[in-house]
């Protein structure tokens, strides 16, 4: 499937997952989400939690466009590198929300209230020498 050249491009991240989202006006009546060349439902193995992470941004924009009587659908072409499926879905949500803000700047308060514009900076802590894991120490013996 060829990707159109016009549209909005934004990136997002979570843990070690990095995402690049290209948002393009849809040529047909329905919008589609393509992740690494596959439909989102196939890529995320029909997992409702991961799909809901992504679709919440789409739902907010859909409701807002109905209120403003705008009938524009968008296709999302997404490239994901690294991380697990959960981190990838959260990174996609962040990048999608950033993309939709380019088109609908008045949605910032909606996305901000729900925490969709904040990158979760928590990552795995590194292992320290002398310890078994990041914080787990070997058993201590007094005698």
Task: Show where each model-derived region lies.
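Basic, glycine/proline-rich low-complexity segments that contact nucleic acids
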Residues: 86-89, 93, 97-143
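Short, flexible coil/turn micro-motifs enriched in small/turn-prone residues
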Residues: 7, 32, 77-82, 90, ...
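Mid-chain, well-packed structural core segment of small domains
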Residues: 65-97, 101
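Contiguous, often N-terminal, cationic amphipathic patches that form binding interfaces
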Residues: 1-74, 126-143
């Amino acid at each position: 499937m060829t990707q159109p050249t016009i549209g909005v491009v934004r990136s997002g991240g979570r843990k070690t997952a990095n995402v690049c989202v290209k948002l393009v006006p849809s040529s047909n009546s329905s919008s589609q989400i393509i992740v690494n060349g596959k439909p989102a439902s196939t890529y995320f193995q029909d997992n409702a939690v991961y799909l809901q992470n992504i679709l919440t941004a789409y739902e907010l924009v859909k409701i807002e466009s109905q209120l403003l009587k705008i009938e524009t659908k968008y296709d999302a072409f997404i490239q994901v590198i690294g991380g697990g499926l959960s981190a990838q879905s959260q990174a996609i949500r962040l990048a999608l929300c950033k993309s939709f803000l380019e088109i609908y700047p008045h949605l910032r308060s909606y996305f901000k209230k729900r925490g969709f514009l904040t990158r979760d900076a928590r990552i795995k802590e590194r292992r320290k020498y002398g310890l078994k894991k990041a914080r787990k120490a070997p058993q201590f013996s007094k005698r």
